[in-house]
Amino acid sequence: MHIARFCLLSSMAVLALSAGYVSGAVIEIPDEILDSARFISLYSDGLRQKRQLNLSGPGSEHAGTIRLDGQRNIFDNGRTRVDGTGSYQLDYARGMKPIHGAGLGAEVNHNIWRGRGGQSLDLYGGATRQFNFGNRPNEWGAHGGIRYNF
């Protein structure tokens, strides 16, 4: 069990260093978190990824969050682009069960106008679905608008 904890802490440190973000220090990780390490290690390669690791110390009851975000281009014909997104989040605190969450989403961008100097005017819209496994309700989100790039 000590080897598994060491491996998990080492992988968390690598995630944190690659993200450039660490807060506080890890003192103890509940055993339930070790079960989640398998999912994190299976997270697919080839995505544009953002990793965030937030670990806090004794002042906040050994609480923290591990979040992985990925984005992949699904379709692109030069004027219309569709990107898919996915995320996994693990919230934990000493004395409580970890809360897992996953999200899926898509965004569509359509170019309306393109200038000679590289400017562009785009319409965009997207939706996300957050699945929370625990006591929190699932959530929907939507966004859209006009984007001018200069």
Swiss-Prot record:
It comes from Riptortus clavatus. GO terms for biological process: defense response to bacterium; innate immune response. Coiled coil: none annotated. This is Probable antibacterial peptide. It is found in: Secreted. Residues 1-19 form the signal peptide. GO terms for cellular component: extracellular region. Keywords: Antibiotic, Antimicrobial, Immunity, Innate immunity, Secreted, Signal. Has antibacterial activity in vitro. The keyword Secreted applies. Its main location: secreted.
